[in-house]
């Protein structure tokens, strides 16, 4: 690929069928990363009103906590911030970060990932003038009030 593309839209596919042929196939996000020799990728679901980006891709839920790191959060939010500016023409992106744990961890009472990885990453990103929230509770993040 010659870096001429600005976006790629993929459709649903049966991972089960593809994995029966290629045992190393995880998902098209990882496949596209491999064939484009990209350093990192960001999976995003987008509509006219909302864009949702994922910190991880196709991994079992039990592996998510050990996959989350300060560096991962920083890299993903930097990619998201730049894409919102350059590909969605949003001059000042307002990025909300969802917590990994219920109620965004309740200050370490329900999981430590927010305290150990996510909040330090956000503090570093804010120093770089990226408009990003502290972790918010995922169970209310998509309510009408929260989306205003």
Regions found by a protein language model. Name each.
Residues 1-148:
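Anion-binding alpha/beta catalytic cores of soluble intermediary-metabolism enzymes, centered on
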């Amino acid at each position: 690929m010659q870096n001429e593309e600005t976006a790629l839209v993929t459709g649903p596919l049966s991972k089960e069928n593809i994995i029966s042929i290629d045992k190393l196939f995880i998902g098209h996000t990882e496949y596209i990363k491999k064939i484009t020799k990209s350093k990192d990728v960001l999976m995003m679901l987008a509509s006219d009103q909302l864009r949702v980006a994922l910190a991880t891709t196709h991994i079992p839920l039990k592996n998510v906590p050990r996959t989350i790191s300060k560096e991962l959060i920083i890299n993903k939010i930097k990619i998201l911030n730049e894409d919102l500016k350059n590909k969605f023409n949003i001059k000042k992106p307002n990025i909300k970060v969802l917590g990994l744990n219920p109620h965004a961890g309740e200050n370490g009472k329900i999981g430590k990932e927010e305290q150990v990885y996510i909040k330090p990453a956000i503090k570093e990103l804010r120093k770089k003038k990226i408009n990003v929230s502290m972790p918010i509770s995922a169970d209310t993040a998509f309510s009408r009030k929260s989306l205003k």
